[in-house]
């Protein structure tokens, strides 16, 4: 280590001492090396390693640091000849094992183990597994909740529950209690923090202006109003200077400015003064007229005025709707609710702690709180312990300081020397990305601002040189953050101290890699033939194929990278590439796409753990072992390799017994069905079912008699499933996933919780929370592209990094709940008025949402910084947009300024990484020249890197697909010819290429068809029988890959950030019709409540929900059929799935064999009356208002065959004919009968 050449700033960080030191270490700046060298230098200078406290973020980091220190000490022993020094180093080597180089939790554990008697704690405690802790919390809360209901004499607990829960469940309050517990526990004094959040609702002297939070709010409002005022004043002055054509507008704008000034002045008066002034504010219209001066002014002023009008209206709506009297009434009710909440929260915390102590168990949070209690104990003995720590540790070294919370900070400062300080804190606030773990970057920011003052004793050291990345990565990162990060949007200035400095001078000068921004443009995808299976199904698919093709091109171009270990250039390998994204929600799609392109890929994070085939099948089997009367898990197991039933076999079993649970159909097939012993199909099916039921019975008995882990291992062993998945693609990973499930079951049983049912329930809860049960990483030397989240990549580096899905929207769910929590601002709630059936968002809630938005945006900027700085040599950013032209126009408008920093309004409205990056690169000279039509101004500066902005559309990808398919054709005969003959045998080539399969039509037809696909093959739907009219099988759509997954992905209309499409609104309307309760009157209020419930439960996107035409739904229920549905709900069946087995050659005449096709569909609704059966299907097709009758005729022609097929299926299920068939056209609210 001594051989390494350190920079001046690194030497300063290694050698400076005698006071508190904060080291701000940018990405790639050699932070760990500096930390280790600092410890080594202290040892060299005679200090004992056990007199240092070194706190790391992870156990792996602590182990690595110990090993590096050990290696350095051993090296010193071998280097020095002085016997005294050798003895000193040898002693340090012995002391290293017991040195306090560990995680904070491990340090807290050592405090408690040594001084447990100070707080009267049983020393025989164990540390709970996080899984056990989660389960115990829920168990404790369930018991406490029942008690609170029973002794709720004043009804306050019921009111609290109703306020934070839905009509159907009281889990809303449970979620709040558990989240509030986590928030409060991240503070040194949870009780004090809880009392403070209630204080925000206290009104001193019945004057809201005396409330501390109101004064903070008004300060923030004044800043925003002053910004609006200045913009309006600027436009007013321009209108005045515009002469006679703008005279009237100038006068109106001047009145606006005066009114704004009045509002700003009123902020020093009473609340009612402000509220009345705000309510009177009216904005004038832009001037009208065709004169050039008017047109030019309007073109300039329109977007500016719209922006500040929107901002003003937001302020007015969120803060100034209520008078002071109304506000006080709301605050009083809210305060009463908060006090009850805090009372319940304290009871839960106490009960949870007592339960843990009874079990002699602690969790990680307890370790921190108990350690703090010991070091802050006011008894004489407690004070002596604190002094001992302060005297023992000559220095307290904290790694990743940006990620600690106030509780952890208090522990560390309590054991450090108070004066002079001896804390050495290292981190990079630009990489603080763990708010969900209660990390508080403000602690770092505060010291960063304080320590840079040279007049005070403490010191700040900047490590800015990046020794990881090539210059192009540094320059691009600086390019982006110079334009988007400051204290207003980002919480810190991206100044000279924050910028990356190029330090990796070992890269060869000839290696040049420009950063690429690749955008898939979905606006041209509609050119695909609507009646054919699209090569690119949607914009996400387009982006993934674009990424795969770019990777293929890297290899086709024989790309080379610089190998730092070998210190030479070499060919690119797949393992040199990493794909980073915000979430793992589309991991499965990415893996599927890469497999199609033959690109090996390894998933390093586990967002989709529960959706992996092997885990979902195992969970399905465990469910039916516990209770076989569950149709979906049972079907999954029967279809899986464990049983291996085919679709036609599944259908045959159901046909035998159409009603009841599917398990009953299995029993009926074995015990009651009349089987033909000469029928090979039936006999083979009987063998499979018999074996399966025997095995299921065996496993059920084992579940009752043995442990969960024994059951799991027996399943793995006796079914051979563990070995089977090892032979699948990514076999080692799949086996590790099953081992992880086994380990989790073992951990579960080692806790106090037992039983298969509880374990299945626990796993489902973890799945719903996207929590725990992560895949075990497979450490292999497989050369594969790495796929991981940005959070998972922190601390890692890769030669080539793709930041993908950059258009993925930020999560804003905090704003939509019934409460919002913030460490600093407290808690904001929605108050329910049950008398008037109103929900009131308190001013506190709206204020805290605003604060959290700012914090969330700052963290998203930091996440982006982490992503960009993982790249060593090349950075490629990808995204997908609905229209590239619209997107580029939006970016160009946002950066219409000569300032380097993009206006805060534009930066704060961003909802994804791509918009920040896009706005920043629109002024890069190379982009300005290439996309000159957008008239953006060039960014001025000397260190502006070239950026390649590429817009890719579907036609370009399709062209490339053809080339890719040709290059990767895997025809063995052709490969042999190509390998051994310089000139291929043309005749043999033709023979191979012209080969015709005897039943070629069957190769283009799947054994499973949905009705929506099969409807395309009807020529004469009115004459539907088992034999269809003649259809050319060649015209049938080629099947896409089919798979079954219990996907938790939201529907498409939950994911689009753009204006909802008509089809999405229709689909949402369809959903409302499906879910409305027919046992209550259907009116506008009921429908709105249902829509609100679906939005709250994240089933519907709010943007789509707002576009649902409630009148369309009411019109349906006003119709005769709608009234029939309301009057006879017991006769109505909705969303009924069916399967129908039909001969394939009847559907596709060119199919020559006797194969069958399983038709599957879902009937929207049917009425089973005494005298008739009525079939109803909702359709979302758009019908032009100007040609309604023609449009209806087209819809009838389009769906007549499908509806007739539904009718045949329904008739066969009910054993009676369908008498009436209807379509309800949602776009026009018309009921149409099908003859």
Curated annotation (Swiss-Prot):
<keyword id="KW-0378">Hydrolase</keyword>
<dbReference type="GO" id="GO:0003690">
    <property type="term" value="F:double-stranded DNA binding"/>
</dbReference>
<comment type="similarity">
    <text>Belongs to the helicase family. AddA subfamily.</text>
</comment>
<dbReference type="GO" id="GO:0008408">
    <property type="term" value="F:3'-5' exonuclease activity"/>
</dbReference>
<dbReference type="Pfam" id="PF13361">
    <property type="entry name" value="UvrD_C"/>
</dbReference>
<dbReference type="InterPro" id="IPR014017">
    <property type="entry name" value="DNA_helicase_UvrD-like_C"/>
</dbReference>
<keyword id="KW-0067">ATP-binding</keyword>
<feature type="binding site">
    <location>
        <begin position="25"/>
        <end position="32"/>
    </location>
    <ligand>
        <name>ATP</name>
    </ligand>
</feature>
<comment type="subunit">
    <text>Heterodimer of AddA and AddB/RexB.</text>
</comment>
<keyword id="KW-0269">Exonuclease</keyword>
<feature type="domain" description="UvrD-like helicase C-terminal">
    <location>
        <begin position="501"/>
        <end position="795"/>
    </location>
</feature>
<dbReference type="GO" id="GO:0043138">
    <property type="term" value="F:3'-5' DNA helicase activity"/>
</dbReference>
<dbReference type="InterPro" id="IPR014152">
    <property type="entry name" value="AddA"/>
</dbReference>
<dbReference type="GO" id="GO:0000724">
    <property type="term" value="P:double-strand break repair via homologous recombination"/>
</dbReference>
<keyword id="KW-0413">Isomerase</keyword>
<dbReference type="InterPro" id="IPR027417">
    <property type="entry name" value="P-loop_NTPase"/>
</dbReference>
<keyword id="KW-0227">DNA damage</keyword>
<dbReference type="InterPro" id="IPR014016">
    <property type="entry name" value="UvrD-like_ATP-bd"/>
</dbReference>
<dbReference type="InterPro" id="IPR011604">
    <property type="entry name" value="PDDEXK-like_dom_sf"/>
</dbReference>
<keyword id="KW-0234">DNA repair</keyword>
<keyword id="KW-0238">DNA-binding</keyword>
<keyword id="KW-0347">Helicase</keyword>
<dbReference type="InterPro" id="IPR011335">
    <property type="entry name" value="Restrct_endonuc-II-like"/>
</dbReference>
<comment type="function">
    <text>The heterodimer acts as both an ATP-dependent DNA helicase and an ATP-dependent, dual-direction single-stranded exonuclease. Recognizes the chi site generating a DNA molecule suitable for the initiation of homologous recombination. The AddA nuclease domain is required for chi fragment generation; this subunit has the helicase and 3' -&gt; 5' nuclease activities.</text>
</comment>
<dbReference type="InterPro" id="IPR038726">
    <property type="entry name" value="PDDEXK_AddAB-type"/>
</dbReference>
<protein>
    <recommendedName>
        <fullName>ATP-dependent helicase/nuclease subunit A</fullName>
        <ecNumber>3.1.-.-</ecNumber>
        <ecNumber>5.6.2.4</ecNumber>
    </recommendedName>
</protein>
<feature type="domain" description="UvrD-like helicase ATP-binding">
    <location>
        <begin position="4"/>
        <end position="470"/>
    </location>
</feature>
<keyword id="KW-0547">Nucleotide-binding</keyword>
<dbReference type="GO" id="GO:0016887">
    <property type="term" value="F:ATP hydrolysis activity"/>
</dbReference>
<dbReference type="GO" id="GO:0005829">
    <property type="term" value="C:cytosol"/>
</dbReference>
<dbReference type="InterPro" id="IPR000212">
    <property type="entry name" value="DNA_helicase_UvrD/REP"/>
</dbReference>
<keyword id="KW-0540">Nuclease</keyword>
<dbReference type="Pfam" id="PF12705">
    <property type="entry name" value="PDDEXK_1"/>
</dbReference>
<dbReference type="GO" id="GO:0033202">
    <property type="term" value="C:DNA helicase complex"/>
</dbReference>
<dbReference type="GO" id="GO:0005524">
    <property type="term" value="F:ATP binding"/>
</dbReference>
<dbReference type="Pfam" id="PF00580">
    <property type="entry name" value="UvrD-helicase"/>
</dbReference>
